[in-house]
Amino acid sequence: MAQATATTEKLNKFEKLKLEKDGLAVRDQIQHFASIGWEAMDPGDREHRLKWLGIFWRPVTPGRFMARLRIPSGILQSQQLNALANFLQRYGDQASIDITTRQNLQLRGLLLEDTPEFLERLHAVGLTSVQSGMDNVRNITGSPVAGLDAAELFDTRSLIQALQDDLTAAGQGNSEFTNLPRKFNIAIEGGRDNSIHAEINDLAFTPAYQDGTLGFNVWVGGFFSSTRVAPAIPLNAWVPADHSVIRLSRAILEVFRDNGSRGNRQKTRLMWLIDEWGIERFRQVVSEAYGAPLAAAAPELMDWEKRDFLGVHPQKQAGLNFVGLHVPVGRLTTEDLYELARLADTYGQGEVRLTVEQNVILTHIPDAQLPTLLAEPLLTRFSPQPAPLSRGTVSCTGSQYCNFALIETKQRAIAIAQSLEAELDLPRPVRIHWTGCPNSCGQPQVADIGLMGAKVRKDGQMVEGVDIFLGGKVGYDAHLGEKAMTGVACEDLPDVLRQLLIERFGAQARSH
C-alpha cells in the first residue's frame, strides 16, 4: 500500500486502521476467515478491510455479506451472468442482485465461508471485485452503447478496460492506489449526450477535438456527500484519446494520494484539495506528475440531451439493434440473471450491458429477431417502453439492506410511481431518484425530483420522510438540483408528488 506524504494533521480512524494493516493483506487470509467464521474475525478486518476485496459486512443482515463487482463500462457476457446465478442460487430467497448507478452489480446474501469459492468463480469467468470499496477507485463508467452508437465520437471500451487493469493490476489488486484519502470515481464519455454524468465524478473525460485530433477535456472534483455536493469543474486540460488518459489518471490519483487531507473524513474527497490549493496550483502539480505540459481544453462536443437507451435502437452495424430494458429500481433475482443470459445468447451475441439508470441493454439483435424477443415473457416485467414515472425512477438500496439508510426506498419507489401513473397523464418522462440517506448513492441531485431519506416528526412521532430536491438536469448543460422542501413524511409523499407533477411538469389528472 502506497504511503501518504507525512502530515501534521490528526488522522481519522480509517487512516489509523489502514496504517495498522494493508487493506489488500486480507487476500491471503480469506481462507482463514472462512474457516473461523464472521463472529470470530477481528472487527477491523470484517467491517472494513474486506471491502478492499469487494466483500461488505452488512449489519442489517448479520452473517450475510454483500459483494460489489467491478464491471468496466457495465459490459457483461452471458457466461458471467450464468456463473453468478449458479453461485447465488444456493441462497434461495436470501440472494438478491442490484444494478448500481455506476453500471455495476452488488450481490447480496453471501456467506463468509463461501467467499474463497466465490472469488475463485469470479476469476474463472474474467470478473473481479478487488478495490471496489473503501478508499479506492470505484467502477469506471462509460457510455453503455460504446461501439454500437452510430453517432459516437470514440469507442471508450478498450480504454476503460485498460485503465481498470492498470489501477487494479488486472484485477489482482494494485497497492499503488489502495490508500487514497477517500473513494474516487472516474468516468469516460465517448458520445455527445453525457451518459456518464460527468459532473458528479471526481475525474471525468469528455470528448473534444484539438486541432483536428479527437481527445478528451478533463473535469475534476465532482462528488456527493452527507455534508456537501459539488459539481466537477474544468481542469482546462485536454489529452488525446490514447494512453495519455491512463497517464493523466495516474498523475491525478498520485497527487490526490500524496496530498489529500486524511483528517476530517467529511473533507477528504478530491474537491477539498482543489479548494485548498486553487485550480491553477492543482493543475500545475498534476502537470508535473504527468511529466509534460497540459494542453488547454478544447471546445466541448457534448451537445445532446441525455438518452436513457430504453426501447429498440439500430446499431451502427447494419441489420443489428440494441434493446434497452427497464429493470424496476435495478433489482434482479438469480432467475433474472439466467433469463437475461438466455436472451443474450438466443437473440444476440451473448452480451448484456448495464446503465447508470439501473437498467439493462441487450445488444446485437438482428432485425428479424426483434418481434420474437419483444414477445418474451421477461419483457412484461422488464419493459422496453415503461410508463413515464417508472421509466425514470432510480433508487438506492434503502433500509432493507443498508444500515445508513433512514427509510425504505426500492419498494416504496415502485409503489408510488405506479400509483401516480394510474392517476395522472404526463406529457414526458419525469426522473425521480430516491436515496435513503444524505450519502446520496441514489443521486437525487441529478433528478427532476430527488428524494432524500430523513426522519421527520408528524403528530408527535418520528416517522420515515424525505427532503425533496428539484431542478437537476443531465446531458447537455447539466446542473445539480437544489433542496426545495424538507421534512415531508413518506405517507404524505404521494399527495405532495402529485401536486409537484401537476404544477411543474404538466401532469393532468386522468378522468375515470
UniProtKB/Swiss-Prot annotation:
Belongs to the nitrite and sulfite reductase 4Fe-4S domain family. Siroheme binds at C441. This is Ferredoxin--nitrite reductase. Its EC number is 1.7.7.1. One of its GO terms (molecular function) is 4 iron, 4 sulfur cluster binding. PROSITE patterns: NIR_SIR. The gene is nirA. GO terms for biological process: nitrate assimilation. It comes from Synechococcus elongatus (strain ATCC 33912 / PCC 7942 / FACHB-805). It holds the Pfam family NIR_SIR. [4Fe-4S] cluster binds at C396, C402, C437, C441. It comes from the Bacteria. Keywords: 4Fe-4S, Electron transport, Heme, Iron, Iron-sulfur, Metal-binding, Nitrate assimilation, Oxidoreductase, Transport. InterPro entries: Cbl_synth_CobG-like, NIR_SIR_4Fe-4S, NiRdtase/SiRdtase_haem-b_fer, Nit/Sulf_reduc_fer-like_dom_sf, NO2/SO3_Rdtase_4Fe4S_dom, NO2/SO3_Rdtase_4Fe4S_sf, NO2/SO3_Rdtase_FeS/sirohaem_BS. The keyword Transport applies. It catalyses: 6 oxidized [2Fe-2S]-[ferredoxin] + NH4(+) + 2 H2O = nitrite + 6 reduced [2Fe-2S]-[ferredoxin] + 8 H(+).
